Curated annotation (Swiss-Prot):
Its EC number is 1.1.1.-. Disruption phenotype: Impairs the production of flavoglaucin and congeners, and leads to very low accumulation of the carboxylic acid (8E,10E,12E)-3,5,7-trihydroxytetradeca-8,10,12-trienoic acid. The keyword Translocase does not apply. Pfam families: adh_short. The PKS fogA releases the carboxylic acid (8E,10E,12E)-3,5,7-trihydroxytetradeca-8,10,12-trienoic acid as its product, as well as derivatives with one and two double bonds. GO terms for cellular component: endoplasmic reticulum; lipid droplet. The active site is at residues 147, 151. NADP(+) binds at residues 8, 34, 55, 147, 151, 180, 182. The keyword DNA-binding does not apply. This is Short-chain dehydrogenase fogD. The lineage of its organism: Eukaryota, Fungi, Dikarya, Ascomycota, Pezizomycotina. Belongs to the short-chain dehydrogenases/reductases (SDR) family. It comes from the Eukaryota.
Protein backbone atom coordinates (compact mmCIF):
# COMPACT_ATOMS: atom_id res chain seq x y z
CA UNK A 1 0.00 0.00 0.00
CA UNK A 2 1.49 3.35 -1.07
CA UNK A 3 2.13 6.09 1.46
CA UNK A 4 -0.47 8.84 1.65
CA UNK A 5 0.56 12.44 2.19
CA UNK A 6 -1.37 15.29 3.83
CA UNK A 7 -0.16 18.91 3.81
CA UNK A 8 -1.60 21.31 6.39
CA UNK A 9 -0.77 25.03 6.42
CA UNK A 10 -0.71 27.11 9.57
CA UNK A 11 0.48 24.56 12.15
CA UNK A 12 1.70 26.94 14.84
CA UNK A 13 1.48 25.74 18.41
CA UNK A 14 -1.95 25.96 20.02
CA UNK A 15 -3.99 26.23 16.83
CA UNK A 16 -6.30 24.12 14.72
CA UNK A 17 -3.52 23.35 12.25
CA UNK A 18 -1.40 21.66 14.91
CA UNK A 19 -4.36 19.52 15.95
CA UNK A 20 -5.15 18.56 12.35
CA UNK A 21 -1.58 17.58 11.46
CA UNK A 22 -1.32 15.54 14.66
CA UNK A 23 -4.49 13.65 13.72
CA UNK A 24 -3.30 12.88 10.19
CA UNK A 25 -0.03 11.54 11.63
CA UNK A 26 -1.94 9.47 14.19
CA UNK A 27 -3.83 7.82 11.34
CA UNK A 28 -0.61 6.68 9.68
CA UNK A 29 -0.58 9.34 6.97
CA UNK A 30 2.71 11.09 6.21
CA UNK A 31 1.83 14.50 7.64
CA UNK A 32 3.55 17.61 6.30
CA UNK A 33 3.11 20.75 8.38
CA UNK A 34 3.96 24.35 7.63
CA UNK A 35 4.82 27.16 10.03
CA UNK A 36 5.81 30.75 9.42
CA UNK A 37 9.57 31.14 8.81
CA UNK A 38 10.14 32.87 12.17
CA UNK A 39 7.60 30.77 14.09
CA UNK A 40 8.63 28.18 16.72
CA UNK A 41 8.47 24.59 15.43
CA UNK A 42 9.69 22.58 18.43
CA UNK A 43 6.22 21.12 18.98
CA UNK A 44 6.32 19.56 15.51
CA UNK A 45 9.90 18.32 15.83
CA UNK A 46 9.08 16.63 19.14
CA UNK A 47 6.11 14.88 17.52
CA UNK A 48 8.27 13.63 14.65
CA UNK A 49 6.20 15.52 12.08
CA UNK A 50 7.76 16.73 8.83
CA UNK A 51 7.56 20.51 8.62
CA UNK A 52 8.66 23.29 6.31
CA UNK A 53 8.59 27.10 6.56
CA UNK A 54 5.82 28.83 4.61
CA UNK A 55 4.38 32.29 4.20
CA UNK A 56 1.19 31.81 2.18
CA UNK A 57 1.24 35.48 1.15
CA UNK A 58 4.62 35.08 -0.56
CA UNK A 59 4.77 33.53 -4.04
CA UNK A 60 8.41 32.51 -3.74
CA UNK A 61 7.77 30.85 -0.37
CA UNK A 62 4.94 28.77 -1.83
CA UNK A 63 7.07 27.73 -4.81
CA UNK A 64 9.91 26.68 -2.50
CA UNK A 65 7.46 24.59 -0.50
CA UNK A 66 6.09 23.00 -3.66
CA UNK A 67 9.58 21.93 -4.74
CA UNK A 68 10.23 20.36 -1.34
CA UNK A 69 6.90 18.56 -1.24
CA UNK A 70 7.30 17.27 -4.80
CA UNK A 71 10.68 15.82 -3.90
CA UNK A 72 9.29 14.21 -0.75
CA UNK A 73 6.10 12.76 -2.23
CA UNK A 74 7.13 12.00 -5.80
CA UNK A 75 4.77 14.63 -7.16
CA UNK A 76 1.53 13.48 -5.51
CA UNK A 77 -0.50 14.96 -2.67
CA UNK A 78 -3.51 13.19 -1.19
CA UNK A 79 -4.81 15.98 1.04
CA UNK A 80 -4.22 19.73 1.13
CA UNK A 81 -5.67 21.54 4.13
CA UNK A 82 -5.75 25.33 3.90
CA UNK A 83 -5.75 26.21 7.58
CA UNK A 84 -3.39 29.19 7.89
CA UNK A 85 -5.39 32.18 9.04
CA UNK A 86 -5.35 35.33 11.13
CA UNK A 87 -8.04 37.38 12.85
CA UNK A 88 -8.76 41.09 13.09
CA UNK A 89 -11.36 42.36 15.54
CA UNK A 90 -12.85 45.82 15.06
CA UNK A 91 -16.11 47.56 14.22
CA UNK A 92 -16.76 47.94 10.51
CA UNK A 93 -16.70 51.75 10.68
CA UNK A 94 -13.39 51.86 12.59
CA UNK A 95 -11.60 49.31 10.42
CA UNK A 96 -7.97 49.79 9.44
CA UNK A 97 -8.19 48.79 5.78
CA UNK A 98 -4.48 48.00 5.58
CA UNK A 99 -4.91 45.44 8.37
CA UNK A 100 -7.84 43.91 6.53
CA UNK A 101 -5.81 43.68 3.33
CA UNK A 102 -3.17 41.71 5.24
CA UNK A 103 -5.87 39.40 6.56
CA UNK A 104 -7.33 38.82 3.08
CA UNK A 105 -3.81 38.04 1.86
CA UNK A 106 -3.59 35.22 4.40
CA UNK A 107 -7.17 33.98 4.73
CA UNK A 108 -8.32 34.20 1.10
CA UNK A 109 -5.44 34.72 -1.31
CA UNK A 110 -3.29 32.24 0.64
CA UNK A 111 -5.59 29.27 -0.10
CA UNK A 112 -5.99 30.48 -3.69
CA UNK A 113 -2.22 30.55 -4.10
CA UNK A 114 -1.82 27.09 -2.56
CA UNK A 115 -4.44 25.52 -4.82
CA UNK A 116 -3.00 27.27 -7.88
CA UNK A 117 0.42 25.76 -7.28
CA UNK A 118 -0.52 22.37 -5.80
CA UNK A 119 -3.56 21.37 -7.87
CA UNK A 120 -1.55 19.21 -10.28
CA UNK A 121 -0.18 17.11 -7.40
CA UNK A 122 -3.67 16.72 -5.95
CA UNK A 123 -5.20 15.74 -9.30
CA UNK A 124 -2.51 13.08 -9.80
CA UNK A 125 -3.47 11.56 -6.44
CA UNK A 126 -7.23 12.07 -7.00
CA UNK A 127 -7.00 13.69 -3.61
CA UNK A 128 -8.89 16.20 -1.49
CA UNK A 129 -8.74 19.90 -0.70
CA UNK A 130 -9.99 21.03 2.70
CA UNK A 131 -10.66 24.72 3.29
CA UNK A 132 -11.14 25.76 6.90
CA UNK A 133 -14.03 28.21 7.03
CA UNK A 134 -16.05 29.59 9.92
CA UNK A 135 -19.56 30.29 11.14
CA UNK A 136 -18.36 33.90 10.91
CA UNK A 137 -18.69 33.57 7.15
CA UNK A 138 -22.40 32.86 7.63
CA UNK A 139 -23.57 35.16 10.43
CA UNK A 140 -23.05 38.92 11.05
CA UNK A 141 -21.05 38.44 14.25
CA UNK A 142 -20.27 41.87 15.70
CA UNK A 143 -16.74 43.27 15.67
CA UNK A 144 -15.86 40.60 13.12
CA UNK A 145 -17.11 42.16 9.89
CA UNK A 146 -13.70 42.01 8.20
CA UNK A 147 -12.82 38.52 9.43
CA UNK A 148 -16.32 37.37 8.51
CA UNK A 149 -15.80 38.78 5.03
CA UNK A 150 -12.61 36.76 4.55
CA UNK A 151 -14.37 33.56 5.57
CA UNK A 152 -17.43 34.29 3.42
CA UNK A 153 -15.11 34.86 0.45
CA UNK A 154 -13.17 31.67 1.18
CA UNK A 155 -16.34 29.64 1.54
CA UNK A 156 -17.91 30.83 -1.69
CA UNK A 157 -14.63 30.35 -3.58
CA UNK A 158 -14.33 26.87 -2.08
CA UNK A 159 -17.92 26.10 -3.07
CA UNK A 160 -17.15 26.93 -6.69
CA UNK A 161 -13.80 25.14 -6.55
CA UNK A 162 -15.65 21.96 -5.55
CA UNK A 163 -17.72 22.05 -8.74
CA UNK A 164 -14.72 22.87 -10.92
CA UNK A 165 -12.58 20.06 -9.48
CA UNK A 166 -15.28 17.38 -9.74
CA UNK A 167 -14.33 16.34 -13.32
CA UNK A 168 -10.89 15.39 -11.96
CA UNK A 169 -12.37 13.34 -9.08
CA UNK A 170 -10.84 15.77 -6.58
CA UNK A 171 -12.97 16.23 -3.47
CA UNK A 172 -13.30 19.73 -1.98
CA UNK A 173 -14.60 20.08 1.57
CA UNK A 174 -15.52 23.43 3.07
CA UNK A 175 -15.40 23.19 6.86
CA UNK A 176 -17.76 25.56 8.64
CA UNK A 177 -16.06 25.73 12.01
CA UNK A 178 -17.91 26.61 15.17
CA UNK A 179 -16.10 27.96 18.21
CA UNK A 180 -12.98 25.88 18.78
CA UNK A 181 -10.57 26.33 21.69
CA UNK A 182 -7.48 27.87 20.04
CA UNK A 183 -5.19 30.85 20.48
CA UNK A 184 -6.21 32.66 17.27
CA UNK A 185 -7.38 35.72 19.23
CA UNK A 186 -4.13 36.17 21.17
CA UNK A 187 -2.87 38.90 18.82
CA UNK A 188 -6.13 40.83 19.19
CA UNK A 189 -6.13 40.98 23.00
CA UNK A 190 -4.42 44.39 22.96
CA UNK A 191 -6.88 45.94 20.53
CA UNK A 192 -9.05 48.85 21.67
CA UNK A 193 -11.59 51.09 19.99
CA UNK A 194 -10.04 54.24 18.52
CA UNK A 195 -10.55 57.50 20.37
CA UNK A 196 -13.71 59.26 19.25
CA UNK A 197 -15.34 56.13 17.85
CA UNK A 198 -19.12 56.14 17.64
CA UNK A 199 -18.83 52.87 19.57
CA UNK A 200 -16.97 54.51 22.49
CA UNK A 201 -19.91 53.94 24.90
CA UNK A 202 -19.15 50.22 24.47
CA UNK A 203 -15.39 50.56 24.93
CA UNK A 204 -15.36 48.35 28.01
CA UNK A 205 -17.63 45.80 26.33
CA UNK A 206 -15.19 45.71 23.42
CA UNK A 207 -12.19 45.28 25.71
CA UNK A 208 -13.89 42.36 27.43
CA UNK A 209 -14.76 40.87 24.05
CA UNK A 210 -11.19 40.79 22.71
CA UNK A 211 -9.77 39.42 25.97
CA UNK A 212 -12.53 36.88 26.57
CA UNK A 213 -12.23 33.14 26.88
CA UNK A 214 -15.33 31.78 25.13
CA UNK A 215 -17.32 29.73 27.67
CA UNK A 216 -18.43 26.97 25.32
CA UNK A 217 -15.85 25.80 22.82
CA UNK A 218 -14.99 22.52 21.16
CA UNK A 219 -11.65 20.95 22.01
CA UNK A 220 -9.37 21.39 19.01
CA UNK A 221 -8.24 17.76 18.98
CA UNK A 222 -11.85 16.56 19.04
CA UNK A 223 -12.54 18.97 16.17
CA UNK A 224 -9.50 17.68 14.28
CA UNK A 225 -10.51 14.04 14.66
CA UNK A 226 -13.88 14.75 13.04
CA UNK A 227 -12.55 17.00 10.27
CA UNK A 228 -9.79 14.57 9.32
CA UNK A 229 -12.22 11.66 9.27
CA UNK A 230 -14.49 13.63 6.93
CA UNK A 231 -11.60 14.58 4.65
CA UNK A 232 -10.67 10.92 4.17
CA UNK A 233 -14.15 9.79 3.18
CA UNK A 234 -14.73 8.86 -0.46
CA UNK A 235 -17.90 11.00 -0.54
CA UNK A 236 -17.46 13.78 2.04
CA UNK A 237 -19.90 16.56 2.81
CA UNK A 238 -19.62 19.61 0.58
CA UNK A 239 -19.97 21.79 3.67
CA UNK A 240 -18.95 20.09 6.90
CA UNK A 241 -20.30 21.92 9.94
CA UNK A 242 -18.48 21.15 13.18
CA UNK A 243 -17.72 22.90 16.44
CA UNK A 244 -19.57 24.67 19.22
CA UNK A 245 -22.70 26.56 18.08
CA UNK A 246 -22.39 25.30 14.49
CA UNK A 247 -25.52 23.11 14.59
CA UNK A 248 -27.68 25.92 15.99
CA UNK A 249 -26.32 28.44 13.50
CA UNK A 250 -26.84 26.05 10.61
CA UNK A 251 -30.48 25.57 11.63
CA UNK A 252 -31.17 29.29 12.04
CA UNK A 253 -29.43 30.12 8.77
CA UNK A 254 -31.47 27.54 6.87
CA UNK A 255 -34.91 28.04 8.36
CA UNK A 256 -35.16 31.55 9.81
CA UNK A 257 -35.48 34.99 8.27
CA UNK A 258 -32.27 36.80 7.31
CA UNK A 259 -32.55 39.36 10.11
CA UNK A 260 -32.95 36.80 12.91
CA UNK A 261 -29.38 37.66 13.90
CA UNK A 262 -30.16 41.35 14.38
CA UNK A 263 -32.20 40.88 17.54
CA UNK A 264 -29.91 38.15 18.88
CA UNK A 265 -26.75 40.23 18.53
CA UNK A 266 -28.54 43.41 19.66
CA UNK A 267 -28.98 41.78 23.06
CA UNK A 268 -25.69 39.86 23.10
CA UNK A 269 -23.58 42.95 22.37
CA UNK A 270 -25.65 45.46 24.35
CA UNK A 271 -26.48 47.61 21.34
CA UNK A 272 -29.40 49.14 23.23
CA UNK A 273 -26.85 50.85 25.49
CA UNK A 274 -25.11 52.26 22.42
CA UNK A 275 -28.37 53.51 20.94
CA UNK A 276 -29.32 55.26 24.18
CA UNK A 277 -25.91 56.92 24.43
CA UNK A 278 -26.06 58.08 20.82
CA UNK A 279 -29.62 59.41 21.18
CA UNK A 280 -28.70 61.27 24.37
CA UNK A 281 -25.67 62.86 22.73
CA UNK A 282 -27.68 63.85 19.66
CA UNK A 283 -30.30 65.59 21.84
CA UNK A 284 -27.61 67.60 23.63
CA UNK A 285 -26.23 68.80 20.31
CA UNK A 286 -29.59 70.09 19.10
Amino acid sequence: MSTKFALVTGCGQGGIGEALITEYARRGIHAIATVLPAEPSDHLARAGITFFPLDVTNEESVLELKARVQKLTGGRLDVLVNCAGIAYTMTAIDTDVAAVQRMFNVNVFGPMRMVHHFHDMIIKATGAIVNIGSIGGVVPYLYGSSYNATKAALQHWSNTLRVEMAPFDVRVITVISGEVATNILKNDAHRRLPEGSYYSPLAENFRQHVTRTPPRTTDRFQYAANVVAESLRSSPSAWFWYGSQSTLIRFLDMFCWRTVWDSLFWRMFDLGKLKEAHSSKAKKQV
